[in-house]
């Protein structure tokens, strides 16, 4: 395995007025509304969704009240690709994406004829920030013998430079297939997920050195101590986490796979190493079980995310109502980039169909664990 030497800065705006760093993101997180304000806003949003003939698609990591609203209005709460596919297949001509910018872009790529709105266009992603399209394209040009595989958490421009786009649910299978055909790979942007897949497949992978702000903060030593407090708990880990966290997992998988594991595993307590937003859906899916957040770098004093994405937290009821009322914050993707970016997405979907694999969890926990479980030492 090789890697780039690429420092990643999250605390500065990359382009003033278009994206924001961690500090700017936390400053833009809306205040929690009162119970009365919440009820008023939810009623207003429901009326506006009906008026605009719009559908709300939300990610598992946004706040619970937005997930509830999506469920209550016939929308969707899912991972980023399923959000985009739901929007593509829905009759609504206006999609309101509660998530981060690359999710809105992916929705627009799969639904170029639809209007895609977001509560805050500044809501970005550390993986996206850490992989600027111009730098990544130059890096790919320097290694023309390699197949370019990018994670879903990238901009439309980065996807347009790729041969394949993958999600955490199917990335291992696609890389294994490419490796079996003798292909060498550039992987971007998440170094932890890339390293995990490289170790599982043995593929020759040149890794871009990006990381998810949330998952990168989970700590192996603190997780080991927490496991000692809850000896019967199963540990659920997203593969964007560091290696010493993944090594302690009972199940390693995508957001959907982790929810599925929480339902199907015979345990009452789970330690969860992914964004805290997922706990809402886990508690709904498995109401008799207890979910414990995995430890990050500290107790609010030293962690940048404290297990919740600041850019996801920028989505709120008030700015959701505002975007529906005013029709602003629309996502646009250059048509030429959109056409090119769709090719690696369609290639992944075609691979999944040809191998009779779902991009999300299969529903067969044993099968999913064979791909994304890591019991004991890595």
UniProtKB/Swiss-Prot annotation:
Keywords: 4Fe-4S, Cytoplasm, Iron, Iron-sulfur, Metal-binding, Pyridine nucleotide biosynthesis, Transferase. One of its GO terms (cellular component) is cytosol. One of its GO terms (molecular function) is quinolinate synthetase A activity. One of its GO terms (biological process) is 'de novo' NAD biosynthetic process from L-aspartate. Pathway: Cofactor biosynthesis; NAD(+) biosynthesis; quinolinate from iminoaspartate: step 1/1. The keyword Metal-binding applies. Its cofactor is [4Fe-4S] cluster. Catalyzes the condensation of iminoaspartate with dihydroxyacetone phosphate to form quinolinate. This is Quinolinate synthase. It comes from Burkholderia ambifaria (strain MC40-6). The gene is nadA.
């Amino acid at each position: 395995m090789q890697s780039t030497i690429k420092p990643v800065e999250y605390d500065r705006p990359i382009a003033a007025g278009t994206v924001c760093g961690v500090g700017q993101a936390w400053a833009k997180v809306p205040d929690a509304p009162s119970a009365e304000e919440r009820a008023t806003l939810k009623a207003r949003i429901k009326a506006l969704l009906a008026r605009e003939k719009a559908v709300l698609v939300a990610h598992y990591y946004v706040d619970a009240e937005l997930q509830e609203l999506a469920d209550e209005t016939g929308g969707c709460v899912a991972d980023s690709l399923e959000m985009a596919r739901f929007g593509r297949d829905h009759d609504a001509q206006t999609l309101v994406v509660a998530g981060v910018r690359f999710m809105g872009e992916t929705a627009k790529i799969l639904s170029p004829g639809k209007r895609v709105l977001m509560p805050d266009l500044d809501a970005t992603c550390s993986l996206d920030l850490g992989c600027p399209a111009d730098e990544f394209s130059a890096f790919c040009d320097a290694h023309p013998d390699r197949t370019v595989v990018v994670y879903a958490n990238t901009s439309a421009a980065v996807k347009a430079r790729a041969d394949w786009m993958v999600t955490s649910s199917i990335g291992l299978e696609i890389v294994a297939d490419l490796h079996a055909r003798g292909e060498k790979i550039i992987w971007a942007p998440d170094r932890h997920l890339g390293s995990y897949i490289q170790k599982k497949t043995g593929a020759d992978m040149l890794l871009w050195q990006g990381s998810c702000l949330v998952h990168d903060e989970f700590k192996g030593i603190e997780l080991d101590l927490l496991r000692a407090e809850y000896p019967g708990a199963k540990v659920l880990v997203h593969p964007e986490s560091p290696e010493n966290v993944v090594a302690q997992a009972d199940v390693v998988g995508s957001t959907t796979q982790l929810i599925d594991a929480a339902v199907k595993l015979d345990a009452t307590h789970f330690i969860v190493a992914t964004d805290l937003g997922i706990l809402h859906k886990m508690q709904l899916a498995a109401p008799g079980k207890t979910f414990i957040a995995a430890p990050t770098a500290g107790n609010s004093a030293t962690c940048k995310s404290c297990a919740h994405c600041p850019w996801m937290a920028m989505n709120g009821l008030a700015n959701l109502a505002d975007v529906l009322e005013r029709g602003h914050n629309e996502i646009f993707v250059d048509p030429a980039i959109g056409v090119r970016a769709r090719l690696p997405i369609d290639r992944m979907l075609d691979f999944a169909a040809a191998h009779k694999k779902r991009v999300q969890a299969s529903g067969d926990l044993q099968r999913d664990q064979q791909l994304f479980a890591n019991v004991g030492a890595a």
